[in-house]
Structure formats: C-alpha cells, structure tokens
Amino acid sequence: MIDRFGRSIEDLRVTLTHVCNFSCFFCHMEGEDNSQSLLSPEEISLVAKVGIEYGIRSVKLTGGEPTLRRDLLQIIRELKDVGIKEVSMTTNGVLLSTLAWKLKEVGLDRVNVSLHSLDKQLFKEITGVDALDKVIEGIKEAIKAGLRPLKLNFVLTKKNISQLDNIINFAIETGVDELHLIELHPVGLGKNTFEYHEKLESIEKILKERADKIEIRSKHYRPRYYLNNLVIEVVKPYANPIFCAGCNRIRLTADGKLKTCLYRQDKEIDIMDILRGDFSLEEKIELIREAYEIAIAIREPNFKYKVESYAPS
C-alpha cells in the first residue's frame, strides 16, 4: 500500500522493550517514551501478519536491548511462521556470544551491532558499561553463526571520531560486511547531547579518497564506500528530505502503537486496546487492518522538499 507521498511500507520496526543494559549518552530510544507495557509474541506476530497484506516483508527488532526479552526466540520463530521474509535485530552485542547460534536456529537472518569505540575506557564512557570484550566476542560469534550480512552501527560524535580508523580496520579484519556511520541526531537522549554532534562531510571526503568503489544506494540516496571487502554506508537522517522520501518503515512501539515516523509522536495509532480487547480473532484482524490504513493515510515525511512534487527526479 502506498501513502499519499508515493512511498510504500515494507519494513516494520518493532520495539521489544525500553530496558537496556547499556546507557549510551546519545540513545534516540526509537523516538519513544519509556513504557512498562510489553507486547507478547502472539500480539507482535499478529500485527506483523496483518502488515503483510499492506506490503510488510521484513521486521527489525529493536529496543532498548532486544536480547533482554526472555521470549526473544519465540518472537522470532512466530514472525517467521506467519510469513515475514526477513527478521533482523539491532543489538549492543553484549549477550550475542551466548545467543547467536540459537537466534540463527529459530530464523533470525542478520544483526546490526552497535560499536562506538575500541578503546576500553572510551567504550565505558559512552555506554556506561565495561563490556567491550564481550561485544567483540559477540560480533565474532554472530559471524560464525551466519547472521549475515553483519553490520556495525557507529554513531559519530566529537567523543569518538578518533576511533573511526580503528573501527574500519577491525571491521575489515573481522569479516564484518557493512559499517554504518550514523550522524548523531536530536531525538531521545540525543536532544540533550547534541553538543557532541560531528558533521560527516569531512569523513566522507576521506572515504572518497580511500574507497575502491563508490555507489549510491537508491533508497535514501545513501553513499556507499567499498574498502577491501567492507562496505561503509553514511547515514544522515536528520533534516534530510531525501532520507524521508525513501522511508519505507512503520513502527510498532513497545506499548502497542503504530508509529508512522521516528521523529513524530503526534501521528500514532494506539492498537493495544484492540490486541487486548474482548474481540474475536477475526474482529482483531479487521480492526488492525483499519489501524494500518489510518496510519498509512496520515503518514508523511517529517522533512519535506520545498517543491510541489515530493519525490526527487
């Protein structure tokens, strides 16, 4: 199904929990407020199953830290059972060394692992946890288990810009498939720490000189730089109408809302009462369909082109 700006929805991002065993100072918290309510595996899979009718093909599990959900394996299994083609997860990686093979076995396809420093002291300063060795171990185990392409997420700030070369070399040597250089943006805790914002333009200039090949990813018009067997992708979502023009995501919050945009809290459809109301399964499915249709109808880019025609030529 296409929204009024010509954008399809193909990816459902599901926040499994707001709880995290890290405390990164810039966390955007998926643009959500803290909530104690958690959707069950059955509720998540039902929303995803109905979403397939509207174009959903992939589900990204996020948090908080999704590996803290004790029913994570069941959630992944049920998403696969209802027909989701790709299930991926963003994680801090600290529990990945013990979970990687189990995750692969139940159907998880790939992971994004957040890694913002290879210096132990700086890692602890950024995350609040002395766990760098465990994260590195988790990355290596995930690669062995076949959770690929394995992608590293590196949020660039004034604190860790000196770490970038080390991160690139580590990624190449370890067999990481992609490295995402992510611009700090003022959402969640990032609103209070934007003083650490570091522009990516100077980094891109260096990457252009070092890259074996450069291509532009059609979705979001992101540049991708090839260094040896590593792909480095630059992610600049904030105040970026090109990023919004290519957005194919809709979000399911931990407390049961369909959220149409990371940056907006005024365009959400609360479906918790549907999921937990006294309705038959058929009635729930029909009401969730209506919720998707409303969400798609009100969905709009947060950052727009200042022209009549929205999509870039």
Swiss-Prot record:
Binds 2 [4Fe-4S] clusters. Binds 1 [4Fe-4S] cluster coordinated with 3 cysteines and an exchangeable S-adenosyl-L-methionine and 1 [4Fe-4S] cluster coordinated with 3 cysteines and the GTP-derived substrate. It comes from Sulfurisphaera tokodaii (strain DSM 16993 / JCM 10545 / NBRC 100140 / 7). This is Probable GTP 3',8-cyclase. Belongs to the radical SAM superfamily. MoaA family. GO terms for molecular function: 4 iron, 4 sulfur cluster binding; cyclic pyranopterin monophosphate synthase activity; GTP 3',8'-cyclase activity; GTP binding; metal ion binding; S-adenosyl-L-methionine binding. S-adenosyl-L-methionine binds at residues 64, 114. The lineage of its organism: Archaea, Thermoproteota, Thermoprotei, Sulfolobales, Sulfolobaceae. Gene3D superfamilies: Aldolase class I. Pathway: Cofactor biosynthesis; molybdopterin biosynthesis. GTP binds at residues 13, 60, 90, 151, 249-251. Residues 4-224 form the Radical SAM core domain. GO terms for biological process: Mo-molybdopterin cofactor biosynthetic process. It catalyses: GTP + AH2 + S-adenosyl-L-methionine = (8S)-3',8-cyclo-7,8-dihydroguanosine 5'-triphosphate + 5'-deoxyadenosine + L-methionine + A + H(+). It is an enzyme of class 4 (lyase).
